[in-house]
A protein has these predicted regions:
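Residue-level "edge-of-site" marker
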Residues: 13-14, 51, 94, 186
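Active-site acidic/histidine proton-transfer and metal-coordination neighborhood
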Residues: 20-120, 130-132
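Histidine-acidic metal/acid-base catalytic patches
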Residues: 42-43, 101-123, 127-188
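Short, structured active-site "lid" loops
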Residues: 4-8
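Active-site-adjacent beta->alpha loops and helix N-cap segments on the catalytic face
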Residues: 1-2, 163
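Conserved radical SAM core fold
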Residues: 14-19, 52-56, 152-156
Length: 188
């Protein structure tokens, strides 16, 4: 990767037993270990569903307690990441996968609540296609914290064969002079 001028970003979702909303101390331990491993391979960031996992759904908006627990866990994780020279990203995912964080704006609000300069928003066009009012607006909303994007079609298939408006996305990225990472995430 280095020879090709590419950067390494590791991505994960927390296992159920350490979802930050329910077990912040477990999440902190898990994320610290993951950050140590990311640093060991020379990654620049750890990102993904670092606040929870796929299947964490209550059918209700997140509670104050859940958000406080997530904030506590990510404050500690961001502090550890900083000691390693790493960035920590937050990927909002759709409501069918979690009730905690579904939009880019919610990720911005969480990052601003935490106040860690080494945290960033990680958008995913698959999830944006489900949750956002428009891809361009989501990109504009997150612009001050946006550093990484998963490019994925609406059906996780071949780009251009689904309903994602790629032109809208790339026009918005040009409008904010996006300099972050783009990763293709396709299940073909």
């Amino acid at each position: 990767l280095e020879a090709a001028g590419m950067r390494t970003v590791c991505s994960l979702g927390l296992p159920e037993k350490v979802w930050a909303s329910q077990n912040p101390d477990g999440a902190i331990a898990f994320l610290k270990l993951a950050l140590d491993k990311a640093a060991a391979i020379g990654a620049e960031a750890l990102s993904g569903v670092v606040y929870g996992g796929i299947g964490e759904r209550s059918g209700l908006p997140p509670t104050k307690s859940e958000l406080d627990n997530v904030t506590h866990a990510l404050e500690a994780a961001a502090a550890h990441a900083k000691t390693l020279g790493l960035l920590l990203g937050i990927e909002p995912v759709n409501r069918y996968e979690t009730h905690l964080l579904n939009t880019g704006w919610q990720a911005v609000e969480l990052i601003e609540r935490i106040g860690a300069e080494n945290m960033f928003v990680h958008l995913d066009t698959y999830h944006m296609n489900i949750e956002e009012k428009g891809a361009a607006q989501a990109i504009l909303d997150a612009r001050d914290h946006l550093r990484y994007i998963h490019l994925s079609e609406s059906d996780r298939g071949t780009p251009g064969m689904g309903t994602v408006d790629w032109e809208e996305i790339f026009v918005a990225l040009r409008a904010i002079d996006f300099q972050g990472g783009l990763a293709m995430e396709s299940f073909v």
